[in-house]
């Protein structure tokens, strides 16, 4: 009896740690791509109200990349295979955005938008994998299927 209770408690603790790792990575990748988006706005590739100048932005991007890397290590340690693969795909698509703002990849605003949408799709896939790993059964709607996103943007009315 004691042994089964101990195992349940241990499983609960690992689930909590896994949740923390997944959330930390999601937050770190969001910070990274937010800085990249603001840098892209400063280059005229993206329409955001708070563009960042290259000198300040690249330093912030480097800091965000360090944090993203640290957070990824926790996903590697605590995550299941599917979530780890989804996190790797997500980071690769985030790096594409970084290449645009570091002038390592040329392109137009349309190219940036396409790369950003691909990143968003990979982010959705990461969330789906993380939710499955954590046993979250509530429905999750992909951006590509969400009627709110597919409808007209009220900012453009």
Listing of model-derived features with the role each one plays in the protein:
Residues 1-157:
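Conserved non-transmembrane functional hotspots
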């Amino acid at each position: 009896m004691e042994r089964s209770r101990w195992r349940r408690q241990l499983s609960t603790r690992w689930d909590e740690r896994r949740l923390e790792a997944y959330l930390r990575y999601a937050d770190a990748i969001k910070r990274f791509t937010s800085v990249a988006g603001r840098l892209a706005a400063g280059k005229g590739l993206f329409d955001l109200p708070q563009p960042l100048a290259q000198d300040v932005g690249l330093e912030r991007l480097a800091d965000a990349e360090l944090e993203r890397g640290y957070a990824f290590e926790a996903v590697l340690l605590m995550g299941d295979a599917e979530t780890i693969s989804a996190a790797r795909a997500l980071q690769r698509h985030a790096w594409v955005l970084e290449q645009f703002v570091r002038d390592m990849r040329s392109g137009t605003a349309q190219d940036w938008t396409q790369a950003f949408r691909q990143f968003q799709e990979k982010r959705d896939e990461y969330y789906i994998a993380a939710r499955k790993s954590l046993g979250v059964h509530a429905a999750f709607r992909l951006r590509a299927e969400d009627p709110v996103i597919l409808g007209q943007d009220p900012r453009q009315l």
